[in-house]
């Protein structure tokens, strides 16, 4: 997932319209709290399709909360909690969306185990801030569970999902990498 400004503007507007329409409909039918929607964009035609709806947080939720809470807003989870606390609150959604329209570039990569076999993990990298030097070598700078501490494009946060003694299997999420900047260029190929 690359989260960046200026990309796919027409498609982004279509996603916003679809999400707003569905959210309004769910609210009218009594649904309260946060939910996540995944959209698929055909980058050849510009068509936008609804991929799935999750009545919970999803793999993209951390990125969404990173953007909303870092750039002068409240985490979306805060609004979720307000709904379930029966708090009396109001928000101007257009102002919130306007504030969140400009932000830094962030990327998230979910690392999956691709092989069709089950194996015990003997050793796994630690969660924390990792840094790449000029030679392309990476090292753990500090253990952490907070990706807000990523300070530049030479650093990334790695969240370890499984550790030594756990089992890996085909499709298992092995870890999540969050970095500043984009991991793909406009041609959808990985950056250096």
Regions flagged by a language model, labelled:
Residues 1-192:
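ATP-dependent carboxylate activation and anion-phosphoryl transfer catalytic cores
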């Amino acid at each position: 997932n690359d989260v960046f400004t200026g990309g796919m503007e027409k498609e982004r507007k279509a996603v916003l319209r679809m999400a707003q329409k569905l959210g309004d409909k769910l609210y009218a039918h009594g649904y309260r709290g946060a939910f996540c929607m995944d959209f698929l964009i055909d980058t050849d035609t510009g068509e936008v399709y609804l991929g799935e709806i999750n009545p919970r947080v999803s793999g993209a939720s951390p990125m969404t909360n990173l953007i909303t809470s870092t750039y002068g807003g409240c985490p979306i989870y805060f609004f979720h909690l307000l709904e379930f606390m029966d708090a009396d609150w109001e928000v101007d959604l257009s102002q919130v969306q306007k504030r969140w329209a400009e932000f830094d570039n962030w990327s998230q990569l979910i690392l999956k185990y691709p092989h069709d076999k089950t194996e015990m993990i003997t050793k796994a990298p630690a969660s924390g801030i990792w840094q790449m030097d000029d030679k392309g070598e990476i090292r753990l700078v500090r253990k952490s569970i907070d990706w807000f501490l990523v300070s530049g494009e030479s650093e990334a946060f790695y969240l370890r999902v499984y550790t030594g003694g756990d089992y890996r299997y085909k499709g298992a999420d092995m870890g999540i990498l969050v970095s500043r900047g984009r991991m793909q260029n406009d041609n959808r190929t990985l950056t250096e």
